[in-house]
Regions:
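Hydrophobic residues within membrane-embedded alpha helices
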Residues: 13, 20, 66-69
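Intrinsically disordered, low-complexity terminal tails
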Residues: 1-3, 33-37
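Bacterial N-terminal signal peptides
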Residues: 19-32
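Short helical patches
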Residues: 5, 21-24, 43
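Copper-binding active sites and cupredoxin-like electron-transfer domains
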Residues: 35-372
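N-terminal secretory signal peptides that target proteins for export/translocation
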Residues: 1-14
Length: 372
Protein backbone atom coordinates (compact mmCIF):
# COMPACT_ATOMS: atom_id res chain seq x y z
CA UNK A 1 0.00 0.00 0.00
CA UNK A 2 1.16 3.57 -0.64
CA UNK A 3 0.19 6.90 0.90
CA UNK A 4 0.59 10.43 -0.50
CA UNK A 5 -0.33 13.56 1.45
CA UNK A 6 0.42 17.13 0.43
CA UNK A 7 -0.24 20.55 1.87
CA UNK A 8 -3.29 22.06 0.14
CA UNK A 9 -2.79 25.15 -1.96
CA UNK A 10 -4.15 28.32 -0.37
CA UNK A 11 -4.31 27.07 3.21
CA UNK A 12 -2.70 29.16 5.91
CA UNK A 13 0.03 27.69 8.05
CA UNK A 14 -2.38 27.63 11.02
CA UNK A 15 -5.02 25.76 9.01
CA UNK A 16 -2.48 23.25 7.80
CA UNK A 17 -1.06 22.74 11.30
CA UNK A 18 -4.57 22.21 12.69
CA UNK A 19 -5.34 19.65 10.00
CA UNK A 20 -2.02 17.91 10.63
CA UNK A 21 -2.73 17.82 14.38
CA UNK A 22 -6.12 16.21 13.73
CA UNK A 23 -4.47 13.76 11.36
CA UNK A 24 -1.78 12.92 13.94
CA UNK A 25 -4.38 12.22 16.61
CA UNK A 26 -6.32 10.03 14.20
CA UNK A 27 -3.14 8.16 13.25
CA UNK A 28 -2.27 7.57 16.90
CA UNK A 29 -5.77 6.18 17.43
CA UNK A 30 -5.42 3.89 14.41
CA UNK A 31 -1.94 2.73 15.41
CA UNK A 32 -3.05 2.02 18.97
CA UNK A 33 -5.75 -0.26 17.63
CA UNK A 34 -3.25 -1.91 15.31
CA UNK A 35 -0.91 -2.43 18.26
CA UNK A 36 -3.65 -4.14 20.23
CA UNK A 37 -4.31 -6.39 17.26
CA UNK A 38 -0.62 -7.29 16.98
CA UNK A 39 -0.50 -8.23 20.67
CA UNK A 40 -3.53 -10.43 20.21
CA UNK A 41 -2.07 -11.95 17.07
CA UNK A 42 1.22 -12.70 18.85
CA UNK A 43 -0.44 -14.68 21.64
CA UNK A 44 0.65 -18.33 21.45
CA UNK A 45 -1.91 -21.00 20.71
CA UNK A 46 -1.53 -24.62 21.68
CA UNK A 47 -3.77 -25.84 18.88
CA UNK A 48 -2.57 -23.48 16.15
CA UNK A 49 -3.24 -24.73 12.63
CA UNK A 50 -1.53 -23.01 9.74
CA UNK A 51 -3.96 -21.33 7.36
CA UNK A 52 -2.85 -21.06 3.73
CA UNK A 53 -2.26 -17.44 2.74
CA UNK A 54 -4.43 -16.47 -0.19
CA UNK A 55 -2.36 -14.94 -2.97
CA UNK A 56 -4.24 -13.27 -5.84
CA UNK A 57 -3.38 -15.30 -8.91
CA UNK A 58 -5.71 -13.75 -11.48
CA UNK A 59 -3.93 -12.29 -14.47
CA UNK A 60 -4.63 -8.55 -14.53
CA UNK A 61 -5.52 -7.45 -18.05
CA UNK A 62 -5.61 -3.71 -18.77
CA UNK A 63 -7.32 -1.15 -16.58
CA UNK A 64 -10.54 0.84 -16.39
CA UNK A 65 -12.00 3.71 -14.39
CA UNK A 66 -14.87 2.63 -12.16
CA UNK A 67 -18.32 4.00 -12.84
CA UNK A 68 -19.58 5.38 -9.52
CA UNK A 69 -23.28 6.09 -9.04
CA UNK A 70 -25.45 8.08 -6.67
CA UNK A 71 -28.20 6.21 -4.84
CA UNK A 72 -30.61 4.75 -5.82
CA UNK A 73 -28.75 4.05 -9.07
CA UNK A 74 -26.35 1.13 -9.49
CA UNK A 75 -23.47 0.79 -12.00
CA UNK A 76 -24.09 -1.65 -14.86
CA UNK A 77 -23.41 -5.34 -14.31
CA UNK A 78 -19.86 -6.38 -15.18
CA UNK A 79 -19.71 -8.33 -18.44
CA UNK A 80 -15.95 -8.91 -18.80
CA UNK A 81 -14.64 -12.36 -17.94
CA UNK A 82 -11.14 -11.36 -16.80
CA UNK A 83 -9.65 -9.43 -13.90
CA UNK A 84 -8.47 -5.88 -14.50
CA UNK A 85 -7.03 -2.91 -12.66
CA UNK A 86 -9.93 -0.71 -11.55
CA UNK A 87 -9.26 2.95 -10.76
CA UNK A 88 -11.70 4.33 -8.17
CA UNK A 89 -11.70 8.11 -7.76
CA UNK A 90 -13.58 9.12 -4.62
CA UNK A 91 -13.81 12.67 -3.28
CA UNK A 92 -14.70 13.56 0.31
CA UNK A 93 -16.95 16.62 0.35
CA UNK A 94 -18.53 18.31 3.37
CA UNK A 95 -21.70 20.05 2.22
CA UNK A 96 -25.05 21.25 3.53
CA UNK A 97 -27.89 19.07 2.25
CA UNK A 98 -31.60 18.53 2.80
CA UNK A 99 -32.47 16.13 5.63
CA UNK A 100 -36.23 16.80 5.61
CA UNK A 101 -38.54 19.53 4.34
CA UNK A 102 -37.14 22.77 5.74
CA UNK A 103 -34.41 20.89 7.60
CA UNK A 104 -30.76 21.04 6.53
CA UNK A 105 -27.68 19.24 7.79
CA UNK A 106 -23.99 19.55 6.97
CA UNK A 107 -23.23 16.09 5.62
CA UNK A 108 -19.74 14.62 5.39
CA UNK A 109 -19.95 12.66 2.16
CA UNK A 110 -18.10 10.32 -0.16
CA UNK A 111 -18.68 11.82 -3.59
CA UNK A 112 -21.01 14.64 -2.58
CA UNK A 113 -24.07 12.40 -2.29
CA UNK A 114 -25.90 10.56 0.48
CA UNK A 115 -25.11 7.75 0.87
CA UNK A 116 -21.64 7.57 -0.70
CA UNK A 117 -21.17 6.46 -4.29
CA UNK A 118 -21.83 2.83 -5.19
CA UNK A 119 -18.66 1.03 -6.30
CA UNK A 120 -18.87 -2.13 -8.45
CA UNK A 121 -15.87 -4.38 -9.16
CA UNK A 122 -15.29 -8.05 -9.97
CA UNK A 123 -13.76 -10.78 -7.82
CA UNK A 124 -10.04 -10.93 -8.63
CA UNK A 125 -9.76 -7.29 -9.71
CA UNK A 126 -6.88 -5.14 -8.49
CA UNK A 127 -8.44 -1.94 -7.19
CA UNK A 128 -6.51 1.34 -7.03
CA UNK A 129 -8.41 3.77 -4.81
CA UNK A 130 -7.71 7.50 -4.93
CA UNK A 131 -9.22 9.34 -1.96
CA UNK A 132 -9.24 13.13 -2.22
CA UNK A 133 -10.31 15.35 0.67
CA UNK A 134 -11.80 18.64 -0.49
CA UNK A 135 -9.70 21.66 0.46
CA UNK A 136 -12.71 23.22 2.22
CA UNK A 137 -13.18 20.24 4.54
CA UNK A 138 -12.88 20.95 8.26
CA UNK A 139 -11.45 17.53 9.16
CA UNK A 140 -9.07 14.86 7.88
CA UNK A 141 -10.87 11.77 6.59
CA UNK A 142 -10.07 8.23 5.48
CA UNK A 143 -11.89 5.13 4.24
CA UNK A 144 -12.40 1.64 5.67
CA UNK A 145 -13.86 -0.75 3.10
CA UNK A 146 -15.21 -3.94 4.61
CA UNK A 147 -14.28 -5.68 1.34
CA UNK A 148 -10.56 -5.04 1.94
CA UNK A 149 -8.14 -7.55 3.43
CA UNK A 150 -5.51 -5.23 4.90
CA UNK A 151 -4.79 -2.86 7.83
CA UNK A 152 -7.95 -1.04 8.84
CA UNK A 153 -9.67 -1.99 5.60
CA UNK A 154 -7.58 0.73 3.97
CA UNK A 155 -8.07 3.28 6.75
CA UNK A 156 -4.44 3.11 7.89
CA UNK A 157 -3.20 4.03 4.41
CA UNK A 158 -5.79 6.65 3.50
CA UNK A 159 -5.78 9.30 6.23
CA UNK A 160 -6.08 12.48 4.17
CA UNK A 161 -5.90 16.10 5.31
CA UNK A 162 -8.09 18.80 3.69
CA UNK A 163 -6.80 19.39 0.17
CA UNK A 164 -4.79 16.17 0.18
CA UNK A 165 -4.95 12.87 -1.67
CA UNK A 166 -4.18 9.30 -0.62
CA UNK A 167 -3.76 6.28 -2.87
CA UNK A 168 -3.72 2.59 -2.03
CA UNK A 169 -4.37 -0.69 -3.81
CA UNK A 170 -6.12 -3.88 -2.78
CA UNK A 171 -7.14 -7.18 -4.29
CA UNK A 172 -10.88 -7.88 -4.43
CA UNK A 173 -10.54 -11.32 -2.85
CA UNK A 174 -14.02 -11.91 -1.43
CA UNK A 175 -17.18 -11.53 -3.51
CA UNK A 176 -20.18 -9.95 -1.79
CA UNK A 177 -21.85 -6.67 -0.90
CA UNK A 178 -19.90 -4.58 1.61
CA UNK A 179 -20.18 -1.31 3.51
CA UNK A 180 -17.43 1.28 3.46
CA UNK A 181 -17.14 4.19 5.89
CA UNK A 182 -14.77 6.76 7.34
CA UNK A 183 -12.71 5.48 10.27
CA UNK A 184 -11.02 8.69 11.37
CA UNK A 185 -11.26 9.41 15.10
CA UNK A 186 -13.76 10.08 16.50
CA UNK A 187 -15.21 7.36 14.28
CA UNK A 188 -18.84 7.62 15.50
CA UNK A 189 -18.91 11.33 14.64
CA UNK A 190 -17.72 10.76 11.07
CA UNK A 191 -20.24 7.97 10.46
CA UNK A 192 -23.09 9.86 12.13
CA UNK A 193 -22.41 12.80 9.79
CA UNK A 194 -22.92 10.63 6.72
CA UNK A 195 -19.63 8.96 5.80
CA UNK A 196 -20.70 5.56 4.44
CA UNK A 197 -21.48 3.82 1.18
CA UNK A 198 -21.41 0.42 -0.54
CA UNK A 199 -19.02 -1.62 -2.65
CA UNK A 200 -20.14 -4.70 -4.56
CA UNK A 201 -17.55 -7.33 -5.46
CA UNK A 202 -19.31 -9.39 -8.11
CA UNK A 203 -18.54 -13.13 -8.17
CA UNK A 204 -16.53 -14.24 -11.20
CA UNK A 205 -19.62 -16.02 -12.53
CA UNK A 206 -21.68 -12.85 -12.09
CA UNK A 207 -25.09 -12.46 -10.48
CA UNK A 208 -28.37 -13.89 -11.80
CA UNK A 209 -29.94 -11.61 -14.39
CA UNK A 210 -32.66 -9.23 -13.19
CA UNK A 211 -34.50 -6.34 -14.82
CA UNK A 212 -33.90 -3.66 -12.19
CA UNK A 213 -31.24 -3.02 -9.56
CA UNK A 214 -31.44 -0.33 -6.89
CA UNK A 215 -29.20 0.97 -4.10
CA UNK A 216 -30.94 1.60 -0.76
CA UNK A 217 -29.04 2.47 2.41
CA UNK A 218 -30.54 3.11 5.83
CA UNK A 219 -28.95 5.33 8.48
CA UNK A 220 -29.70 7.52 11.47
CA UNK A 221 -29.21 11.19 12.28
CA UNK A 222 -28.94 12.55 15.80
CA UNK A 223 -29.85 16.24 15.77
CA UNK A 224 -30.12 18.83 18.52
CA UNK A 225 -33.54 19.83 17.20
CA UNK A 226 -36.64 17.66 17.29
CA UNK A 227 -37.91 15.74 14.26
CA UNK A 228 -39.00 18.26 11.64
CA UNK A 229 -37.56 21.28 13.46
CA UNK A 230 -36.68 23.80 10.76
CA UNK A 231 -33.27 25.20 9.95
CA UNK A 232 -29.71 23.90 9.95
CA UNK A 233 -29.35 21.03 12.40
CA UNK A 234 -26.14 19.75 13.99
CA UNK A 235 -25.01 16.49 15.54
CA UNK A 236 -26.07 15.81 19.14
CA UNK A 237 -23.36 13.46 20.41
CA UNK A 238 -25.28 12.65 23.60
CA UNK A 239 -28.23 11.36 21.56
CA UNK A 240 -25.80 9.31 19.50
CA UNK A 241 -24.16 7.79 22.56
CA UNK A 242 -27.59 6.99 24.01
CA UNK A 243 -28.76 5.59 20.63
CA UNK A 244 -31.77 7.94 20.46
CA UNK A 245 -31.98 8.97 16.78
CA UNK A 246 -34.05 11.93 15.69
CA UNK A 247 -34.25 10.60 12.14
CA UNK A 248 -34.01 7.12 10.61
CA UNK A 249 -33.97 7.44 6.83
CA UNK A 250 -33.26 5.76 3.52
CA UNK A 251 -30.64 7.34 1.25
CA UNK A 252 -29.87 10.27 3.50
CA UNK A 253 -33.17 12.12 3.77
CA UNK A 254 -36.84 11.88 4.63
CA UNK A 255 -38.77 11.31 1.39
CA UNK A 256 -35.71 10.41 -0.69
CA UNK A 257 -37.62 7.48 -2.22
CA UNK A 258 -41.18 8.83 -2.37
CA UNK A 259 -43.24 10.89 -4.81
CA UNK A 260 -41.36 11.64 -8.02
CA UNK A 261 -38.26 10.06 -6.43
CA UNK A 262 -39.93 6.66 -5.96
CA UNK A 263 -38.23 3.62 -7.47
CA UNK A 264 -39.85 2.40 -10.70
CA UNK A 265 -40.56 -1.08 -12.09
CA UNK A 266 -43.04 -2.82 -14.38
CA UNK A 267 -45.30 -5.81 -13.85
CA UNK A 268 -43.46 -9.00 -14.72
CA UNK A 269 -39.99 -7.65 -13.95
CA UNK A 270 -37.51 -8.99 -11.42
CA UNK A 271 -36.06 -6.48 -8.96
CA UNK A 272 -32.86 -6.65 -6.95
CA UNK A 273 -32.26 -4.31 -4.01
CA UNK A 274 -28.76 -3.80 -2.65
CA UNK A 275 -29.61 -2.84 0.93
CA UNK A 276 -27.04 -1.36 3.29
CA UNK A 277 -27.09 -0.03 6.82
CA UNK A 278 -24.69 2.78 7.66
CA UNK A 279 -25.87 2.86 11.25
CA UNK A 280 -24.16 4.10 13.24
CA UNK A 281 -26.22 2.21 15.83
CA UNK A 282 -29.45 0.50 14.80
CA UNK A 283 -30.23 -2.85 13.18
CA UNK A 284 -32.75 -2.53 10.35
CA UNK A 285 -35.81 -4.79 10.03
CA UNK A 286 -36.08 -4.32 6.26
CA UNK A 287 -39.46 -5.11 4.71
CA UNK A 288 -41.34 -4.27 1.52
CA UNK A 289 -45.07 -3.95 2.18
CA UNK A 290 -46.97 -5.85 -0.51
CA UNK A 291 -44.14 -8.18 -1.55
CA UNK A 292 -42.29 -11.29 -0.39
CA UNK A 293 -38.55 -11.64 -0.99
CA UNK A 294 -38.00 -14.61 -3.32
CA UNK A 295 -34.28 -14.66 -2.49
CA UNK A 296 -32.27 -13.13 0.34
CA UNK A 297 -28.49 -13.04 0.29
CA UNK A 298 -28.08 -12.78 4.04
CA UNK A 299 -25.63 -10.13 5.28
CA UNK A 300 -24.47 -9.45 1.72
CA UNK A 301 -23.04 -12.91 1.02
CA UNK A 302 -23.03 -14.56 -2.38
CA UNK A 303 -25.43 -17.43 -1.65
CA UNK A 304 -29.20 -16.94 -1.68
CA UNK A 305 -29.53 -18.75 1.63
CA UNK A 306 -33.16 -17.88 2.32
CA UNK A 307 -36.29 -17.91 0.17
CA UNK A 308 -39.85 -16.59 0.64
CA UNK A 309 -38.80 -14.11 3.33
CA UNK A 310 -41.05 -11.37 4.71
CA UNK A 311 -38.49 -9.28 6.65
CA UNK A 312 -34.72 -9.48 6.82
CA UNK A 313 -32.33 -8.01 9.38
CA UNK A 314 -29.56 -5.72 8.17
CA UNK A 315 -26.97 -4.99 10.88
CA UNK A 316 -25.24 -1.66 11.36
CA UNK A 317 -22.20 -1.73 9.11
CA UNK A 318 -23.74 -4.60 7.16
CA UNK A 319 -25.86 -5.36 4.13
CA UNK A 320 -28.31 -7.72 2.45
CA UNK A 321 -29.36 -8.38 -1.13
CA UNK A 322 -33.03 -9.11 -1.79
CA UNK A 323 -34.70 -10.20 -5.03
CA UNK A 324 -38.36 -10.46 -5.96
CA UNK A 325 -40.69 -10.40 -8.93
CA UNK A 326 -43.45 -7.81 -9.20
CA UNK A 327 -46.82 -9.23 -10.26
CA UNK A 328 -49.24 -6.43 -9.44
CA UNK A 329 -49.30 -2.70 -10.30
CA UNK A 330 -49.34 -0.18 -7.48
CA UNK A 331 -47.07 1.26 -4.82
CA UNK A 332 -44.95 -1.09 -2.73
CA UNK A 333 -43.72 0.47 0.51
CA UNK A 334 -40.15 0.04 1.75
CA UNK A 335 -39.87 0.30 5.54
CA UNK A 336 -37.82 -0.49 8.56
CA UNK A 337 -40.45 -2.64 10.28
CA UNK A 338 -39.34 -1.37 13.67
CA UNK A 339 -42.36 0.58 12.63
CA UNK A 340 -42.12 3.86 14.56
CA UNK A 341 -38.92 4.46 12.59
CA UNK A 342 -40.91 4.28 9.34
CA UNK A 343 -43.89 6.47 10.20
CA UNK A 344 -42.37 8.79 12.80
CA UNK A 345 -38.68 9.06 11.94
CA UNK A 346 -38.56 8.79 8.15
CA UNK A 347 -37.52 5.21 7.19
CA UNK A 348 -40.06 4.86 4.39
CA UNK A 349 -39.74 4.62 0.61
CA UNK A 350 -41.78 3.51 -2.40
CA UNK A 351 -41.42 1.25 -5.41
CA UNK A 352 -44.01 2.22 -8.00
CA UNK A 353 -45.03 -0.69 -10.24
CA UNK A 354 -46.80 0.10 -13.52
CA UNK A 355 -48.46 -2.26 -15.99
CA UNK A 356 -51.56 -4.35 -16.56
CA UNK A 357 -53.62 -5.42 -13.58
CA UNK A 358 -53.94 -9.06 -12.62
CA UNK A 359 -57.02 -9.84 -10.53
CA UNK A 360 -55.85 -13.42 -10.04
CA UNK A 361 -52.95 -12.14 -7.93
CA UNK A 362 -55.01 -9.70 -5.87
CA UNK A 363 -58.47 -8.15 -6.12
CA UNK A 364 -60.45 -5.92 -3.78
CA UNK A 365 -63.98 -7.32 -3.51
CA UNK A 366 -65.56 -4.99 -0.99
CA UNK A 367 -64.62 -1.43 -0.16
CA UNK A 368 -64.94 0.54 3.04
CA UNK A 369 -68.40 1.75 2.08
CA UNK A 370 -69.68 -1.75 1.41
CA UNK A 371 -69.81 -1.46 -2.39
CA UNK A 372 -68.48 -4.06 -4.81
Amino acid sequence: MSLHIHRPHGHTVAQTLLALLCALLAMLFTFSLAGCNRVADAAPSSDHTAVPVRVPNDEIVGQEVAVLTEAPNVPPAITRTHATRVIVNLDVIEKTMRLADGVDYTMWTFGGSMPGRFIRVREGDQVELHLKNDEHSTMPHNIDLHAVTGPGGGAKSSLTIPGGESVFTFAALNPGLYVYHCATAPVPMHIANGMYGMILVEPKAGLPKVDREFYVMQSEFYTHGKFGEKGLQTLDMEKGIDERPTYVVFNGAVGSLTGDKALQAKVGERVRLFVGNGGPNLVSSFHVIGEVFDNVYTEGGTVASQHNVQTTLVPAGGSAVVEFGVEKPGDLILVDHSIFRAFNKGALGMLHVSGDDNAKVFASLKGLGGTH
